[in-house]
């Protein structure tokens, strides 16, 4: 609807330029917002105040001329001037009802991408292999997954890329330890303890560390024995990751793995091409690119090191190789990097070097979707009581157990296997939603008690809200798609719910553009609250007439489908009863 209003305003502006009221060459960003007070309209624009000065008119006078120049629209019943010159637009409720009827008949609930479909690479999760995933991997994994789901739902071709850390010193360390301590495959599957023991040896013994580095050199040279061990470690580690992804209900598979090692053969070419472009400078034996835009506190340009003095390559080299693979081989239109906000400088430098070097042959928009930190109650990065790293699988297991106990207390008569299933859906959903509902760039404090609360903006509340809607149809023995009739909007609570339902597509496009799932979370929470008010004030099963009951059932059906689809786009399963 906002796009429709923007188009109407643009047509009015064009007319006023033709009439000589406005000067030529204006290209304002037309802002349309939801009106705060519904008695004064559904949407508001400040366009008259923005253009009053170039028009040489008072805002209210320009607003009057804009209203007169607005084309007629079946979607708008009237437009009024408010305050210093706001344009307030009132929706035509009949047109709104028709749009909702159409949405109910549409698999995508009326949601369409604002622009043309694109090919989008999502760089997400990216754990370092050789040890198990920890809580620090949660945000990249689930935020990336949610945005990928939304983009796919809107019609984009999404390529997920799990840029795992599958190369480097840690593998030499593990191979050296395995040479000293031959163990069985079963023992090796406990990778965390094996890694911890190897790291202890590496830190304590210089001889061991030297041997480990030597094995890395052999690995890089393609030594068959080292490659076989590396493959074994990698497969075990990826198997651990896959179990975590499945528990998280994240759409990542082995086929999505595109680790650091995938770019090994191109690293020397990256350095050679940078040199050919005249971008490389040798600094203390290292090969660097210096960009004037990025300076240290002393005002000196910061180096982007692509090759160390000993010939080794760095993260920047691998990321540059990945950029040109994604642009020139995958032909992506966008590449979204869901990586910690603290890596912002690194990616800004890499993107700029890639542009200057001509690595982005196919036009590709590169966006670092940085995120904040998940902290403990003390406001510091989340740790175990003894200060260690929390395994992600352990956190999720605890969430399942806590939710199971909570659900069992509320529903002691349910069979244990059903309680276990509900506990898993609620527990995993609670952890994910608590994260996704926060602004991507914000830090937040992890709190089991808050996230498992059945009140407030939480997964349990939304899951229960969905079961309420499903319960109405269960009583009737109908599905959401088995209600005839037409939607007719009469009561204020019906209109409020309808107006919010109509915004689903706009919300999804916002998430797709900015990579911000919290916007979808806020929308679903608001929608659940509006349905609750509608349900309490507009009887469905006890409606006054059959046509009124059908209309309200259709509103309820669209609410149920929107809640279910919205939660699915966040990566949350739903339940038919709790």
Curated annotation (Swiss-Prot):
The keyword 4Fe-4S does not apply. Its EC number is 6.1.1.19. It comes from the Bacteria. GO terms for biological process: arginyl-tRNA aminoacylation. Pfam families: Arg_tRNA_synt_N, DALR_1, tRNA-synt_1d. It catalyses: tRNA(Arg) + L-arginine + ATP = L-arginyl-tRNA(Arg) + AMP + diphosphate. Its main location: cytoplasm. It is found in: Cytoplasm. Coiled coil: none annotated. GO terms for cellular component: cytoplasm. A motif ('HIGH' region) lies at residues 127-137. GO terms for molecular function: arginine-tRNA ligase activity; ATP binding. It is an enzyme of class 6 (ligase). The keyword Aminoacyl-tRNA synthetase applies. Keywords: Aminoacyl-tRNA synthetase, ATP-binding, Cytoplasm, Ligase, Nucleotide-binding, Protein biosynthesis. Monomer. Belongs to the class-I aminoacyl-tRNA synthetase family. This is Arginine--tRNA ligase.
């Amino acid at each position: 609807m906002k796009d429709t209003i923007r188009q109407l305003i643009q047509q009015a502006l064009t007319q006023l330029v033709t009439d000589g009221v406005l000067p030529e060459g204006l290209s304002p960003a037309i802002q349309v917002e939801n009106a705060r007070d519904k008695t004064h309209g559904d949407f508001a624009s400040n366009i008259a105040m923005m253009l009053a000065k170039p028009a040489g008119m008072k805002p209210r006078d320009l607003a009057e001329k804009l209203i007169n120049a607005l084309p007629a629209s079946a979607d708008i019943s009237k437009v009024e001037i408010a305050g210093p010159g706001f344009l307030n637009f009132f929706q035509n409720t009949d047109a709104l009802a028709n749009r909702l009827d159409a949405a109910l008949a549409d698999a995508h609930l009326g949601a369409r991408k604002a622009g043309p479909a694109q090919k989008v690479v999502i760089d997400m999760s990216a754990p370092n292999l050789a040890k198990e995933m920890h809580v620090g991997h949660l945000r990249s994994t689930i935020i990336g997954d949610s945005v990928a789901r939304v983009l796919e739902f809107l019609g984009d071709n999404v390529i997920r890329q799990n840029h795992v850390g599958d190369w480097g010193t840690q593998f030499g360390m593990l191979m050296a330890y395995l040479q000293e301590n031959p163990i069985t495959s079963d023992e090796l599957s406990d990778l965390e303890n094996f890694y911890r023991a190897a790291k202890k040896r590496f830190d304590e013994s210089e001889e061991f560390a030297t041997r480990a580095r030597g094995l890395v050199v052999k690995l890089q040279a393609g030594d068959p024995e080292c490659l076989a061990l590396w493959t074994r470690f990698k497969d075990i580690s990826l198997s651990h990751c896959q179990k975590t992804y499945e528990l998280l209900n994240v759409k990542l598979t082995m086929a999505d793995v595109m680790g650091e090692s995938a770019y090994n053969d191109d690293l020397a070419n990256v350095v050679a091409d940078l040199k050919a472009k005249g971008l490389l400078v040798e600094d203390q034996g290292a090969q660097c690119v210096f960009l004037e835009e990025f300076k240290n506190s002393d005002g000196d340009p910061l180096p982007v090191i692509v090759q160390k003095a000993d010939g080794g390559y760095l993260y920047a080299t691998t990321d540059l190789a990945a950029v040109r693979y994604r642009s020139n081989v995958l032909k992506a239109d966008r590449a979204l990097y869901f990586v910690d906000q603290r890596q912002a400088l690194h990616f800004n430098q890499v993107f700029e070097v890639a542009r200057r070097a001509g690595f982005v042959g196919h036009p590709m928009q590169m966006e670092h979707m940085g995120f904040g930190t998940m902290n403990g109650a003390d406001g510091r990065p989340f740790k175990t009581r003894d200060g260690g790293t929390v395994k992600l699988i352990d956190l999720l297991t605890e969430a399942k157990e806590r939710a199971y106990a909570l659900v069992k207390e509320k529903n002691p008569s349910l069979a244990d296997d059903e309680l276990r299933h509900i506990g898993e859906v609620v527990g995993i959903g609670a952890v994910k939603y608590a994260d996704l509902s926060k602004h991507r760039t914000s830090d937040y404090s992890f709190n089991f008690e808050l996230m498992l609360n059945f009140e407030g903006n939480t997964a349990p509340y939304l899951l229960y809200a969905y079961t309420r809607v499903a319960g109405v149809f269960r009583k009737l023995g109908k599905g959401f798609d088995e209600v005839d009739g037409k939607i007719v909007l009469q009561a204020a609570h019906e209109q409020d719910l309808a107006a919010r339902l109509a915004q689903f597509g706009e919300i999804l496009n916002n998430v797709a553009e900015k990579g911000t799932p919290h916007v979808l979370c806020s929308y679903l929470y608001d929608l659940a609250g509006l349905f609750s008010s509608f349900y309490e004030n507009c009887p469905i099963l006890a409606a006054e007439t059959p046509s009124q009951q059908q209309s309200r059932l259709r509103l309820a059906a669209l609410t149920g489908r929107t809640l279910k689809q919205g939660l699915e786009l966040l990566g949350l399963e739903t339940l038919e009863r709790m």
